[in-house]
């Protein structure tokens, strides 16, 4: 029972495809391994292999090269979905890689995950797709500012957008909920939640 909308930058469509592949594998007794399902899944969408594997991972290539990483440290995540959708294809078509001035610190992020350093993770959060999606949808920047101004450890657009998420320490549960309440009062916000990381133990 999931409620991830499509065109939200949260792999909602890919999660549906991954669930369908796993269900068919079970219902028809195909006995395909996750690796085999992932090979089929990438033909449907770049994020499908990740949704089949689950957990925290470094994704490379177009999404088919996955390296497992330690789970996200326990925290609170405020998620806000503006009442708009965005085409992933359009965002990637308009990304000017050669004009990017900064690139995410992938190695530093991996090290922070390995040591469970939540601040190290939030300090390294970056998304180059913001350079495309935010200028076309200023509401995303407004949502980011609201969350940032309410003491989040870090705030970022998810995937190709328009969903935004902010990270809060577990001790700030009341603050995170107040931010959610503020977001829900805004007409331009379709949905807002405060959740915890859903960490999957692989192989179970």
Regions found by a protein language model. Give the residues of each.
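Surface-exposed aromatic
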Residues: 164
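ATP-dependent small-molecule kinase catalytic core of the GHMP/sugar-kinase superfamily
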Residues: 30-153, 167-204
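Flexible nucleotide-binding loop
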Residues: 158
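Short pre-catalytic strand/loop immediately N-terminal to key active-site residues, enriched for Gly-Thr
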Residues: 1-9, 153-155
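DPxDG-like acidic metal-binding loop motif
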Residues: 8-34
């Amino acid at each position: 029972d999931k409620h991830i909308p499509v065109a939200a930058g949260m792999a909602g469509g890919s999660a549906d495809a991954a669930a369908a592949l796993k269900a068919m594998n079970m219902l028809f007794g195909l006995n395909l391994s996750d690796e085999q399902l992932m090979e089929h899944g990438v033909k449907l969408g770049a994020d499908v292999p990740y949704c089949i594997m689950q957990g925290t991972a470094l994704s490379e290539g177009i999404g088919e090269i996955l390296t497992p990483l330690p789970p996200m440290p326990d925290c609170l995540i405020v998620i806000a979905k503006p009442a708009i959708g965005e085409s992933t294809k359009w965002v990637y078509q308009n990304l000017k890689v050669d004009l990017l001035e900064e690139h995410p610190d992938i190695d530093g992020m991996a090290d922070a995950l390995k040591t469970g350093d939540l601040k190290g993770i939030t300090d390294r959060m970056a998304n180059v797709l913001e350079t495309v999606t935010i200028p076309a949808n200023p509401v995303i920047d407004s949502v980011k500012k609201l969350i940032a101004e309410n003491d989040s450890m870090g705030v970022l657009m998810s995937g190709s957008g328009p969903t935004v998420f902010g990270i809060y320490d577990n001790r700030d549960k009341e603050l995170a909920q107040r931010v959610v309440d503020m977001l829900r009062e805004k007409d331009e916000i379709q949905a807002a939640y405060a959740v915890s990381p859903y960490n999957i133990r692989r192989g179970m």
